[in-house]
Design a protein with these regions (language model features):
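C-terminal ends of transmembrane helices
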Residues: 2-7, 51-62, 96-108, 143-152, ...
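Iron-sulfur-cluster electron-transfer modules
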Residues: 256-383, 388-406, 555-559, 563-568, ...
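Ferredoxin-type iron-sulfur electron-transfer modules in oxidoreductases and energy-metabolism complexes
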Residues: 508-519, 529, 533-593
């Protein structure tokens, strides 16, 4: 089943490039003050650059794509070539966009910075007045606007500034020199280009330092400044091609935070019970561990966090584990912003959950029993149950990430938590154990979240396995529109008329179909890889899949993907990256089978 996030980041490559363009425009202020005719020249260069890019995109993709990146390239050349004849500057723009970008496949595919590719031949053809910029404090607005872009490749940008600063200290330059020499300009707008600069911290810092040092030490010739950055571009290209080939050892919790979705959470709303079966709390009885296990097996209790794994087998694995210390974690995190039924259960059926917990404790001896939540409520906890609040990041509720966060134990991809003596059960699974043992009930019902993103609002429903998704949605939100189901907002799929609730469904929602613009203009920003809990080179895998090179993509270990959807959510190019990674993962698994 192909799942995808129903929500996406509001940021895009176009937003980022428009902000860069604004900073580039600000660097022209002192130039325009000297020669107002340069305003017309700037507009001509930018228009020419965008025209070339539009034509190339139509020829390659058979459709229009935003050409703001071409405007940035033309703007950079305009700022650095003041005094060069107009025909030479136009030639530089053409060289930059054709030989610096389009011959490599377009935006995001180029190994060299297009602006510098266009500037390099001009350095041989014309005499440049150095430094690049006029001696004016009017450069300050451009410098201030460009500083935030250090965050894109911070190590390289800071390294460049340190390199130029080292030369300044040696020669006693005044602070104004850092502006007119172009140090801030290059550090923030050129060597932070995510397409052509590596994300490796040490190499980025070192390469940036050497490029910055050369750029000022040989101030008499800008050729050194440009060629040193281009050489670093080539080094970065080789490094980035090799990134992600090392097999991921363990999952990591990224810094990805997802927005709150609902204006009305539904935590205080009445349960929508579609089972026609009353939920009855029963008195606690004493059961031998063997009887508890037998009833769990007979009731076919399964993991209700979304995986649907057999709880009886999981318990046996923990019991048989050779681990000296065993832990029991009740997972109530709900890191997906679309879910709320686990928190609702803790509020309304906490006593039943504690009863289920004690039944499980009768089966094995645990050093600690821990309840993990994202937002703690005022719940009376039983004795010896430890409460642990985890970071509000996605996907903090994933089993191995939770173990790492709570127990400070990092498990490799091959290690199974239950075999290591760690039992992680969703709070609804624990409730289901309570019903199975004390109520002798089959695990054929479940609580789930039903939502309508058009309002946006959600509520908790109790349904029977096998019920049609559309019927449940109609009962909760009549006439609400297109239906989706799955593990949450980040792991949803389109619900057809005959789609039913199975063990893996804990979320049903009416929502507009997500708009993935599927832009081919990946900027190489690396946000998808940074937000991947498995540490995969997501953009590289996706590019290879699109090129029909799934065997080559296998070298980047797509089988380690946990299908969390973080990459699709955060992609600034609007690509459904998780779908590409899943294709590569499926190809690898089929090959191994």
């Amino acid at each position: 089943m192909n799942t995808f996030p129903l929500i996406r980041t509001k940021w895009s490559n176009e937003h980022m490039m428009a902000a860069v363009f604004l900073a580039v425009v600000a660097y022209h202020i002192p130039i325009w003050r000297i020669a107002s005719s340069e305003i017309a020249v700037f507009l001509l260069l930018v228009s020419a650059g965008m025209l070339v890019d539009v034509i190339a995109n139509i020829l390659r993709f058979k459709r229009l794509w935003c050409s703001v990146s071409a405007a940035v390239t033309a703007g950079i050349l305009s700022a650095l070539t003041f005094g060069v004849p107009l025909w030479g500057r136009l030639l530089g723009v053409l060289i930059a966009l054709i030989f610096g970008k389009q011959v490599w496949g377009g935006t995001g595919k180029n190994p060299l910075n297009p602006g510098l590719v266009g500037l390099l031949p001009l350095l041989f053809m014309f005499h440049f007045n150095l430094p690049f910029f006029p001696n004016s404090w009017l450069l300050l607005p451009g410098a201030i606007l460009s500083l935030p872009f250090l965050l894109i490749r911070p190590y390289t940008g800071i390294g460049y500034l340190v390199g130029t600063g080292a030369v300044m200290l040696q020669y006693g330059f005044n602070p104004k020199e850092i502006l007119i020499s172009g140090s801030v300009f290059f550090a923030c707008l050129v060597v932070t280009d995510p397409v052509t600069i590596t994300r490796e911290p040490f190499i980025g810092m070192t390469g940036g330092f050497l490029a910055g040092f050369a750029g000022l030490y040989f101030l008499g010739s800008p050729l050194y400044a440009v060629s040193s950055i281009l050489a670093f571009n080539l080094l970065s290209y080789g490094i980035e091609r090799g990134r992600g080939k090392a097999e991921p050892e363990q999952l990591r919790l990224t810094k990805l935070k997802l927005p709150k979705i609902y204006t009305h959470s539904g935590l205080n709303s009445q349960l929508l019970d579609l089972t026609s079966e009353a939920v009855r709390l029963q008195c606690q009885k004493e059961f031998a561990s063997e009887e508890v296990l037998n009833r769990i097996r007979a009731a076919e209790v399964f993991g209700m966090g979304g995986a649907g794994f057999d709880t009886y087998r999981k318990l046996l694995t923990v019991i048989d584990s050779k681990a000296e210390e065993k832990y029991f974690i009740l997972n109530g995190v709900e890191c997906d912003p679309g879910l709320l039924h686990d928190r609702w259960l803790l509020r309304n059926f906490s006593e039943a959950i504690w009863s289920g917990m004690k039944l499980i404790q009768a089966c094995a001896e645990f050093k600690e029993v821990i309840l993990t939540v994202k937002e703690p409520d005022t719940i009376m906890l039983p004795e010896n149950l430890k409460l642990c609040q985890v970071a509000s990041r996605y996907p903090a509720g994933a089993e191995k990430l939770l173990i790492s966060e709570v127990l400070r134990k990092d498990l490799s991809r091959e290690q199974i938590p239950a075999e290591c003596g760690v039992l992680v059960l969703n709070v609804q699974t624990v409730y289901s154990v309570y019903e199975a043992v004390l109520g002798n009930r089959k695990a054929d019902t479940r609580f789930l979240t039903v939502a309508n993103l058009r309002i946006p609002e959600a509520r908790v429903a109790r349904v029977k396995l096998g019920m049609k998704v559309h019927e449940i949605l109609q009962a909760a939100y009549p006439g609400s529109g297109t239906a989706f189901a799955g593990g949450g907002l980040m792991q949803a799929y389109t619900a057809e008329d005959e789609t039913v609730v199975d063990r893996n469904v804990n979320f049903i929602v009416a929502a507009p179909f997500p708009k993935y613009k599927e832009s081919p203009q990946c900027s190489g920003c690396g946000v998808c890889a940074d937000n991947c809990p498995a540490g995969l080179a997501v953009n590289r895998i996706a590019d290879l899949v699109e090129a029909g090179k799934k065997k080559e993509a296998a070298g980047y270990h797509p089988e380690a993907c946990i299908s969390c959807g973080s990459c699709s959510y955060s992609c600034l190019a609007g690509r459904n990256l998780s779908l590409r990674v899943k294709e590569a993962k499926t190809a690898v698994l089929e090959q191994h089978n």
